[in-house]
From Swiss-Prot:
It comes from Xenopus laevis. GO terms for molecular function: catalytic activity. Residues 494-765 form the Reverse transcriptase domain. It comes from the Eukaryota. InterPro entries: DNA/RNA_pol_sf, Endo/exonu/phosph_ase_sf, Endo/exonuclease/phosphatase, RT_dom. Keywords: Transposable element. This is Transposon TX1 uncharacterized 149 kDa protein.
Length: 1308
């Protein structure tokens, strides 16, 4: 079903004729839903509208002269209207409707014309939208009276405060401007006014929809409305019924926890081995065997599901019955039984939701404390995002019929994957002079693939990936590899001999993922091959072999898939070239090549020939031939599959080998470019740059514009050899310096050339000193969008869960650009504040530094952006100093570093004192300024003595190893820099085979006498060790090596910089700087670097506070066992409570009394309620503490106030008992919290010790039910029946011990 939506500012409809005009216009358009603004309607006019319009009409009036919005439904659109709300009089009308099983929120908006009033309006709109269920779709149309895109207005307009509010609203609620999304380059307007000879045009009328509905949007148009100075904007989108089932079966990994299932699989496969002789080939036997496994899994799942549903139904009936019996009853025993049954039902609901969690791939959701509608909402949004509801045919005709859409997709990919003829001459030209694999590595590649290699490949494969057509997952193969592995190795050995894999391995499901652009164009869907796991095991094993030789045959300027190279090498190079060109006045052209369907157009014949040109052996080439022999794919369109089609061209995206094969395939083209193009040639620094490549993202660097024509010639050779295509019209470039478009060869003038900014590998780069602001605008929008998507989950997630969302799903989106660019402190602070707001959902109870500490140190591990940026800079220094071979950008970095204070130091900067470079960094680009500022935050210790050629490069200035009186003089240092005498080697005269004499030094330093130079030389010589003197004498005698000298990377240790607290720090505190291990900088890990930076950045905040506020009442001694609060048995929200208790992050009576009229007294005993009182000293808690002490004694464990508050350390030898004891402590705090909350809400809570017994018993019974269901009774007994303290277990019964029996039940 298609839905047509329109929006129009009518300029007033009070006149009956104007009303008739508007309604006739809408009928002609055939719109299902129409949003009208500025209607000037009043209640008296409603009858006229209802008589004239056949469908339903909804009004929101203001006055007969201003505002007014009306929403109309056509008579053919009759959804269920759940609510109609006039939110802001005359300006905002909200309809909540249900259609085809989905709920839509239709919002009609008319924004004010003045900036401040408009900003307040958007703030009110945002606040109201927060109340809407995030599970539901948003469709917002109307007159926004503001534009966000410069293309949407004919004359610039001064920005006002409403812009930032509107941008944040759009990002926060993941809204998409449909017309602009489908028409990214078109300029059109919806409002036109001509007055006094001036024309004002803008596109202020827009329709926004939720981003997950974008794939349903078929078209968006602007239609002239003759009676208004506004035009009508319309949207056509599909409304689908409830989602169908998946296109093919997927194995449910939760079955792997069932011992009965595991035994059935192993027994079935052992029996299947007896049927090998009944098949012509092992390939057939393997394929049919996997079908048997699939059927076994499906039958077992049906059986288990039926049993589980029956259990839940029975438990649900018990709870309903207890609810009826509780009506009007005050029977405490009945209440406890109800709570216990209710808790058991909730736990079972949690387990049932796991299937949804697995498909959503968010392990985070597994940590929620209950099954939630949010799980299913997230899945629905993901499913909608992948749905294709309309495609254009080749002639541009829109196709909406599902069968027509499938035919169009299959036809497109059949054409794409069909090979074209290739030119042998072009191939020979490309292959001529290629580097070859060494004989030693070649021999290794030629050996047969072993079972151990397959096993290693399987171990390295990531989890939670979509399976291939057989439905068997990576987890399935890993679990049953001991059974399946040897058989699969035999199948594979035979397959390689015959040159063909089993059919299930040859076939892939082509899943289409949306890209940017109009999703009605099939080319804007990215094909990813979902391959069977057994195929991926083989591909991974071959990939592990191949990666060891890539660096031998692929040039350093291509970094994709080559070990030791990263994408940042490419970005750093282009970034630094731009800065270098601007500083030196170079004129350069940067041309970014747009390659059309690069991975999908690689010709297989060309690929095999290229491998042979690299001198790969026949056995290894045979492996790759077999991997692609008779390959097929089935296109997945929504929830169906097309008929198979031959995969005759391209490398399979989704295959572990695809990236490596593509790098090998494009390398001959890049080699040809390097041979024929001049590129950029520099003498200082000594380097040549022709291109930078990351997979198919190739950017050419040209000083001579003739290089562009040569590049086109090279591309024509490459296209003839491999079927590759470069779309010159979509390629883009940057002209730096004096170059202009008019200077370019005619064929290149139609390319989109910029003079300031180029986007390369996702980063906006320019020659300006500071990064392009667009980078940070997009990052901020990205953060807001991500947090907005998860905002509905926030209160359901634990703090650990929210921290995981922040670190893995939000902050991780900004790291890429922050590694390459220097963000402002304002940007960092703003994003950090957003992240912490999401973590706390209210008051920030502890500082940002404490929140960022890892859990084991008392924090929640929320990433500190500032510390992470410093870590990135330290990692960049690591790569600069120690990368072997050194990336090209390091040469430019050295050139920049040598300009610092004219000292001529590059690597030597990192062994001198920071004062040597911090005073003046203005000669450096902003990125390298930040790098040196970060370096100044740590202390540097050098290991060992300076020996050999390194002594010649030893710096004289600010060098802790060269502490002389003369070198400490500021004047002497300045003169040495001016004279370019900054290293030991600079003081050697190779012509005289001696040290430079005092007279020469005097002249170069500008002194009038030799007294100071003589003394300076003497002090330097006296500082040098005898061994170094001997080496220098040998160098002078031999006359070599002469400058420039090659020095080895500095062997240094980094340590925290010594800092003093302004006052005596408490002990123990949260700072760990004094315990930081001294580590060689070459070997230090990213994790350790981050820890160092985190404690350095937040030093004062951490050293000035105790590790826990409980030090006020509990003496120094044991430390809190932070990780024990979130151990495997403890529910994460319960762990949050224990964590907050230790930090005092709870609203107690004394705290609230400081800010409100709430009483400070404890609601139970009347004494002052601090966190210490509420959770420890209150008289009502003593029976509970006594019960805990008794339980601990029965476990033969020590119980004390420290253990109760701080938790018990988990030891390896006593792990199960320690985990269980920590759970009891966590549940005790939970019942204290719940009973206190119930009391404050006016209830009559059960005693804390009674509620504790109920919770423990309920947990035991729920765990026992799960253990019986999964066949894991032994594990249950080992965990819960320790020493028989809590319960005893038999195959048919779990008996709870007397200590957990409620006292009043015993009395009864």
């Amino acid at each position: 079903m298609a839905l047509s939506i329109s929006t129009l500012n009518t300029n007033g409809c009070r006149n009956p004729f104007r009303m008739f005009q508007v309604l006739s216009f809408l009928r002609q358009g055939g719109y299902s839903v129409s949003f009208l603004q500025e209607t000037h309607t009043t209640p008296e006019l409603e009858a006229s509208w209802n008589l004239e319009w056949k469908g339903r009409v909804f009004f929101n009036h203001l006055t007969w002269t201003s505002c007014g919005v009306v929403t109309l439904f056509s008579d053919s659109f009759q959804p269920e209207v759940l609510s109609a709300t006039s939110v802001i009089p005359g300006r905002l009308l909200h309809l909540r409707v249900r259609e085809s099983g989905r709920t839509y929120n239709l919002m009609n908006v008319y924004a004010p014309t003045t900036g401040p009033e408009r900003a307040r309006f958007f703030e009110s709109l945002s606040a109201y939208m927060e109340t809407i269920d995030s599970d539901e779709a948003l469709i917002i149309g109307g007159d926004f009276n503001y534009t966000l895109d410069a293309r949407d207005r004919n004359v610039p307009k001064k920005r006002d405060s409403s812009e930032s509010v509107l941008r944040e609203l759009i990002a926060h609620f993941s809204l998409v401007d449909v017309w602009r999304e489908q028409n990214p380059e078109t300029v059109a307007f919806t409002y036109v006014r001509v007055r006094d000879g001036h024309v004002s045009q803008s596109r202020i009328d827009r329709i926004y929809i939720s981003s997950h509905l974008m794939s349903r949007a078929q078209s968006s148009t602007i239609r002239l409305a003759p009676f208004s100075d506004h035009n009508c904007v319309s949207l056509r989108m599909s409304i689908a019924p409830s989602l169908p089932k998946a296109a093919y079966w997927h194995f449910n990994n939760s079955l792997l926890e069932d011992e009965g299932f595991a035994k059935s699989v192993r027994d079935t496969w052992r029996g299947w081995r007896a049927f090998q002789d009944e098949f012509a080939t092992l390939n057939q036997w393997w394929d049919v065997g996997k079908v048997h496994l699939k059927l076994l899994c499906q039958e077992y799942t049906k059986s288990v599901s039926g049993q589980r549903n029956a259990e839940i139904e029975a438990l649900n009936g018990e709870v309903l019955d207890l609810e009826q019996r509780l009506s009007g009853s005050e029977d405490q025993a009945l209440q406890c039984e109800y709570l216990e049954r209710k808790e058991a039902l909730r736990n079972m609901e949690q387990r049932q939701a796991r299937g949804a969690f697995v498909r959503s791939r968010m392990q985070l959701l597994c940590d929620m404390d209950r099954g939630s509608r949010f799980f299913y909402a997230l899945e629905k949004k993901k499913g909608n995002r992948k749905q294709i509801t309309c495609l254009f045919a080749e002639d541009g005709t829109p196709l909406e019929d599902p069968e027509a859409i499938r035919d169009r997709a299959r036809s497109f990919y059949q054409n794409l994957f069909s090979p074209d003829p290739i030119s042998p001459d072009a191939c020979e030209e490309l292959w001529d002079g290629l580097p070859v694999v060494s004989e030693r590595r070649k021999e290794r590649l030629e050996t047969p693939i072993t079972l151990d290699e397959l096993s290693q490949a399987l171990r390295l494969m990531p989890h939670n990936k979509s399976p291939g057509l057989d439905g068997l997952t990576i987890e399935f193969f890993q679990f049953f590899w001991d059974t399946l592995g040897p058989d699969f190795h035999r199948v594979l050995t035979e397959a390689f001999k015959k040159g063909e894999l089993p059919l299930s391995c040859r076939r892939a499901v082509l899943s289409l993922l949306p890209k940017k652009g109009d999703l009605r164009l099939i080319k804007n869907w990215r094909p990813v091959s979902l391959l069977s796991t057994d195929y991926k095991i083989v591909a991974k094993a071959i990939s592990l072999r191949l990666k060891s030789v890539l660096a031998e045959v692929i040039h350093p300027d291509q970094s994709y898939t080559v070990p030791g190279r990263t994408i940042f090498d490419n970005v750093f190079l282009i970034r630094d070239l731009l800065h270098f060109a601007r500083r030196t006045g170079l004129s350069l052209a940067f041309l970014s090549l747009d390659q059309e369907k690069a991975f999908d157009r690689v010709d297989h014949q060309y690929l095999i020939g290229t491998l042979q040109a690299y001198s790969f052996g026949p056995q290894f080439v045979g492996y790759l031939k077999t991997m692609y022999a008779s390959a097929e794919c089935l296109v997945k369109i929504n929830w169906s599959l097309t008929a198979p089609l031959a995969f005759g061209r391209g490398v399979r995206q989704g295959c572990p080998l695809s990236g490596q094969l593509y790098s090998l395939a494009i390398e001959p083209f890049l080699c040809l470019l390097r041979k024929r193009l001049t590129g950029l040639v520099l003498k200082e620094p000594d380097m040549r740059v022709v291109l930078s490549a990351y997979a198919d993202d190739v950017i050419l660097v040209a000083q001579d514009l003739v290089d562009l024509e040569r590049a086109q010639e090279c591309q024509e050779v490459y296209a003839a050899a491999s079927s590759a295509r470069i779309n010159w019209s979509k390629s883009s470039g940057l002209l730096e310096g004096s170059l202009k478009v008019d200077f370019l060869p005619p064929a290149f003038r139609d390319i989109s050339w910029e003079s300031k900014i180029i986007k390369y590998l996702g980063v906006y780069l320019s020659a300006e000193e500071y990064p392009v602001s667009q980078n940070f605008i997009e990052l901020e929008e990205c953060v807001l969008t991500r947090l907005g998507k998860w905002k509905g989950f926030a209160k359901v997630l634990s703090m650990r869960g929210r921290a995981l969302v922040i670190n893995q799903l939000v902050a991780s989106q900004i790291w890429y650009r922050l590694i390459c660019l220097s963000p402002t402190q304002e940007f960092i602070a703003k994003i950090q504040r957003r992240l912490l707001d999401f973590l706390w959902i209210g008051k920030h109870w502890v500082s940002a530094g404490v929140s960022s500490l890892p859990l084991k140190e008392g924090g929640q591990g929320v990433v500190c952006i500032r510390s992470q940026v410093h870590t990135f800079r330290l990692q960049q220094i690591q790569r600069y100093l120690y990368a072997d071979p050194s990336p090209q950008w390091c040469t430019l970095a050295s050139s920049f570093y040598r300009q610092v204070r004219n000292m001529g130091y590059d690597r030597q900067l990192f062994i001198i004192e920071p004062e040597g470079f911090l005073r003046n960094l203005s000669t450096l680009p902003a990125y390298y300024q930040d790098t040196l500022k970060t370096w100044s935050m740590v202390s540097v210790l050098r290991q060992g003595a300076t020996e050999g050629e390194d002594i010649l490069n030893e710096p004289l200035l600010y060098n802790p190893s060269f502490k002389t009186r003369m070198l400490e003089s500021i004047s002497i240092r300045r003169r040495l820099c001016q004279a370019q005498l900054t290293r030991v080697g600079d003081l050697l005269d190779f012509e005289k085979s001696d040290w430079v004499d005092s007279q020469a030094v005097m002249q170069r330093m500008g002194f009038l006498t030799t007294r100071v130079p003589h003394r300076l030389l003497k002090e330097i010589k006296d500082t040098i060790s005898p061994d170094s003197h001997t080496f220098i004498d040998g160098v002078l005698h031999a006359g070599e090596p002469r400058p420039p000298w090659n020095s080895s990377p500095p062997d240094i240790i980094i340590a925290p910089k010594t800092r003093q607290s302004p006052q005596a720090p408490p002990s123990p505190n949260l700072s760990q700087l004094e315990n930081f291990p001294l580590t060689r900088f070459h070997d230090i890990t990213r994790k350790l670097l981050y820890s160092l930076m985190l404690h350095t950045v937040h030093f004062l905040a951490l050293i000035s506070r105790y590790d826990t506020i409980w030090r006020r009442v509990l003496n120094e001694g044991e430390r809190p066992q932070w990780r024990a609060f979130y151990s495997s048995l403890v529910p994460r929200p319960t762990g949050d409570l224990s964590w907050k208790v230790l930090h005092g992050a709870l609203s107690t009576g004394e705290y609230l009394a400081r800010f409100t009229d709430s009483p400070a007294a404890c609601p139970f005993c009347g004494k002052g309620e601090s966190v210490f009182h509420a959770y420890f000293t209150c008289a009502r808690l003593q029976p509970l503490l006594a019960l805990l002490r008794k339980l601990y004694l029965q476990f033969w464990l020590h119980f004390s106030p420290h253990v109760y508050i701080f938790g018990r350390p988990v030891s390896r030898d006593n792990k199960e008992k320690d985990l269980l004891s920590n759970l009891l402590l966590a549940l005790a705090k939970l019942v204290i919290h719940k009973s206190r909350k119930q009391c404050l809400e006016g209830g009559n809570p059960l005693p804390a010790e009674v509620l504790f017994r109920v919770l423990v018993r309920s947990r035991i019974r729920a765990e026992y039910t799960q253990a019986v269901f999964t066949g894991r009774l032994k594990e249950f007994a080992d965990q819960w029946a320790i020493d028989g303290v809590l319960c005893s277990v038999s195959p048919d019964l779990v008996s709870v011990q007397t200590i957990l029996t409620l006292p009043y039940l015993s009395a009864l």
